[in-house]
């Protein structure tokens, strides 16, 4: 494949590489890192710094920036990262803005398969999985003995400005830990302190540890390595799998949580209903077969690396350039399908 010229449009909210909690910024950084390893040239620029040239791919990650590209006459690729578009629903301002961004793009990506159907008003939306740095998030394994398991939850809780909204299922994880008499660590930003202020009863569990200091990547890696089960009973995500789930998978940390997708995640016990009993049963089953689960995760962990995602992304980019040659809509669609079929299926 010929070398590509790519501009990833910065969100303008958090620096890249991110110096704190910023999922979209981590994704942009990962795209640049892996695409450059493949020999492509990737710049990260603010939109007002973009001087569009033919044969350059401009990739935006925020709907209003995508629409700004459209108004400036800049052809663009768009990634949908906004879980609010599903939360507020069809017809809402957020949904309509993201739909307009998708329709105005050359091609758009969602990182949750079910959202392709959810945005049924357009045929420009394709699924592209998230990835993980498998070279960084590595396992450290010693078989835990009975009674020595420890649970980990890692998330920034809340929804739509309400820090007390339990989108990530902290209550279910903590109540399950209490029922099983297991230690649990809840990690995230200082915003999580506001969640616990709204739910003071959860802090009564003496084996609960709260880490709300926005941990560094190195601290996060050690947390994955020092716990034995990852809990992710989340009710709303823009990524399936999301970033923390893949970090846990790369670290060979068995997972009990929610997931919508056809791609199998080894070591993931999927809870169908989000409640405490489901989490308890998932933890029990994971403990009962821990050795086999860990081994199955170790065998496939490298398949989740960002490099595989970048390879698929590069194929799409290649066909984006062909679409820019003014193919008709049917030809355009066939090019998208061809790009999808030519790349590895596990991403």
Predicted regions and their residues:
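Donor nucleotide-sugar binding/catalytic pocket of nucleotide-sugar-dependent glycosyltransferases
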Residues: 103-139, 146, 154-156
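Short hydrophobic beta-strand element within catalytic cores of glycosyltransferases
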Residues: 250, 254-257
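Conserved catalytic-core segment of nucleotide-activated headgroup transferases in glycan assembly
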Residues: 146-200, 217
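Nucleotide-activated donor-binding/catalytic signature segment of Leloir-type glycosyltransferases, i.e.
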Residues: 196-221
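Acidic donor-binding loop of glycosyltransferase active sites
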Residues: 225-238, 253
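Acidic anion/phosphate-binding donor-loop and adjacent secondary structure
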Residues: 88-89, 131-148, 162, 324
């Amino acid at each position: 494949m010929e070398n590509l010229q790519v501009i990833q449009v910065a969100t303008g909210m958090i620096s890249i590489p991110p110096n704190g909690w910023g999922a979209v910024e981590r994704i942009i950084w990962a795209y640049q890192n892996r695409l450059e390893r493949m020999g492509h040239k990737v710049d990260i620029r603010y939109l007002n710094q973009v001087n569009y040239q033919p044969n350059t791919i401009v990739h935006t990650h925020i709907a209003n920036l995508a629409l700004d590209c459209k108004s400036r006459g800049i052809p663009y690729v768009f990634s949908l990262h906004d879980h609010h578009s599903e939360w507020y629903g069809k017809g809402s301002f957020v949904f309509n803005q993201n739909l307009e961004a998708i329709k105005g793009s050359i091609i758009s990506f969602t990182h949750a398969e079910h959202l392709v159907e959810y945005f049924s008003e357009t045929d420009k939306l394709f699924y592209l999985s998230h990835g993980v740095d498998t070279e960084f998030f590595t396992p450290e394994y010693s078989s835990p003995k009975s009674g020595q398991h420890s649970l980990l939850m890692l998330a920034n809780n809340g929804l739509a400005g309400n820090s007390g909204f339990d989108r990530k299922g902290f209550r279910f994880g903590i109540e399950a830990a209490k029922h099983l008499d297991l230690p649990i660590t809840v990690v995230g930003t200082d915003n999580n302190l506001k969640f616990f202020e709204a739910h003071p009863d959860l802090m009564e569990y003496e084996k609960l540890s709260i880490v709300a200091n926005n941990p560094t990547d190195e601290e996060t890696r050690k947390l994955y390595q020092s716990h034995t089960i990852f809990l992710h009973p989340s009710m709303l995500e823009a990524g399936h799998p999301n970033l923390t789930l893949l970090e846990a998978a790369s670290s060979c940390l068995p997972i009990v949580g929610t997931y919508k997708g056809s791609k199998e995640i080894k070591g993931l016990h999927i809870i169908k209903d989000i409640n405490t009993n489901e989490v308890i049963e998932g933890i029990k089953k994971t403990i009962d077969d821990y050795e086999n689960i860990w081994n199955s995760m170790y065998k496939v962990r490298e398949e989740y690396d960002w490099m595989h995602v970048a390879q698929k992304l590069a194929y799409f980019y290649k066909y984006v350039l062909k679409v820019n040659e003014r193919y008709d809509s049917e030809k355009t669609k066939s090019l998208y399908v061809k790009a999808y079929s030519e790349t590895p299926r596990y991403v």
